[in-house]
């Protein structure tokens, strides 16, 4: 590979979980009881997790370095400056918005504002908390993943479009979803991920985007 690319590489960071996810990993299922049985201790644990995550991600940035004055995140996006990404809020699928606002949001905001910008990873099952996440300062792009047993991410996004107006949305779409959402995609900045089945499919989709969304 080094010969193929003539020694030119774009290093990317791995990214980090949010403080809630790290605490969940440490506490296991008892984490969800902690909200009710020992909330003060949980808040102290979350502070520790946020501090540890910043320390860990700073080490990643130190190792990866900057690319054209920015950072390539764990999902391959380039963000300006010392950016954090991906930062994950998967645990919000299992807690209420009120719990996120009280326990998670302050620490997520602390992590985001430590850096110049952030790439956030979320899930459609977190629909109830998505507006609270999107309102955190510093989030430049927010991925919304689809989940089983709920509406597709693009439909969840459209329902909450006004409340999620801050970050650039990142949506993994099928060909059918792309073709049926031209109006949405033409009306705003959107990062589209598409899983091509082969090179021909990828080239065909690239041609479709060049035709329907010409660079001005």
List each model region and its residues.
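Active-site loop segments of alpha/beta catalytic cores
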Residues: 1-216
């Amino acid at each position: 590979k080094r010969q193929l690319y003539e020694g030119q590489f774009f290093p990317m960071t791995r990214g980090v979980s949010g403080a809630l996810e790290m605490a969940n990993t440490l506490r296991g299922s008892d984490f969800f009881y902690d909200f009710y049985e020992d909330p003060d201790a949980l808040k102290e644990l979350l502070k520790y997790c946020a501090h540890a995550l910043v320390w860990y991600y700073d080490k990643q940035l130190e190792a990866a370095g900057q690319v054209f004055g920015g950072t390539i995140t764990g999902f391959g996006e380039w963000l300006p400056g010392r950016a954090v990404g991906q930062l994950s809020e998967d645990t919000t699928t299992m807690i209420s918005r009120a719990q996120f606002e009280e326990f998670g949001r302050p620490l997520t905001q602390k992590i985001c504002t430590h850096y110049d910008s952030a790439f956030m990873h979320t899930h459609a099952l977190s629909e109830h908390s998505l507006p609270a996440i999107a309102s955190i300062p510093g989030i430049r792009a927010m991925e919304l993943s689809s989940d089983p047993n709920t509406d597709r991410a693009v439909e969840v996004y459209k329902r909450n479009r006004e409340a999620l107006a801050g970050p650039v949305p990142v949506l993994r779409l099928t060909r059918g979803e792309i073709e049926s959402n031209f109006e949405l995609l033409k009306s705003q900045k959107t990062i589209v991920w598409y899983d091509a089945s082969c090179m021909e499919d990828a080239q065909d989709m690239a041609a479709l985007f060049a035709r329907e969304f010409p660079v001005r």
